[in-house]
Amino acid sequence: MLFRSEVDGAINSDPVGTNTDGSSTIVQDGTLEINGTTYTVRELASQEMKNSAGATWDAATAGNAINTWSASFGDQIDVIASNNDGMGMAMFNAWSSANSVPTFGYDANSDAVAAIADGYDGTISQHADVQAYLTLRVLRNALDGVDIDTGIGTEDDAGNVLSDDVFYYDEASRSYYALNVAVTAENYEDFLDSTVTDAPVSNQLDATAHPTKSVWLNIYNAADNFLSATYQPLLEKYDDLLNLNVDYIGGDGQTEANITNRLSNPSQYDAFAINMVKTDNAASYTALLNQ
């Protein structure tokens, strides 16, 4: 395993740039013993995949990065780990597929899962079906004035309830979390369609007991593969089941104003689900909602 330095008691997640000589102060080499042989594990290179316009998690930038790295030290690259499938697939298609270098991503996007049959080595499903449900279910419960756990850990009047193995609630942060699951060559066929709702929470709410409400929901980057191709389609399926009339706003992944400029009349909505470009920009939204 690798050992990363700490900053103020937390693991330092900064990218190392290039670290082919192992001299980085951010990450230290690790070792791995297999069949009596000890191997050095080194983070050769890492960077934030941000394009020239400022958009992060950028697939094209990742594809360019692996081409640059492979030209400089490609024979040293034994495995690629990407923080999302959009970037992982860009590197897989640009270089690692042709060079048989194991590549792993995150998100379990449909194209990445399908690519496992063609050599993409694996990804992580963050249970987008559960994430999307939780997003809208918390809003539905708040609008109905019922216990926040209704239809989540506690069965609702339509029979909706999540199983314990797909989510957990953290009391300290008052947050629900969907649990991750590895997607590999052994189970990828179960994840080929990433837009299927979770069956135990796919029961229609009664419109009399749960009348239609209007919701404004934004996604910080409409160009993000996971958000646009997996998360939003799931939201659109659940909003019908939960009797929510949702206006979806897709941002550019760069500026808060691109989103807030499209919230001109907050009073027409009953609830809001906000996905900020930067997590320290909450005031941009609360200022509008307080008008």
Regions found by a protein language model. Give the residues of each.
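A residue-level marker of the well-folded mature domains of exported/periplasmic proteins
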Residues: 1-291
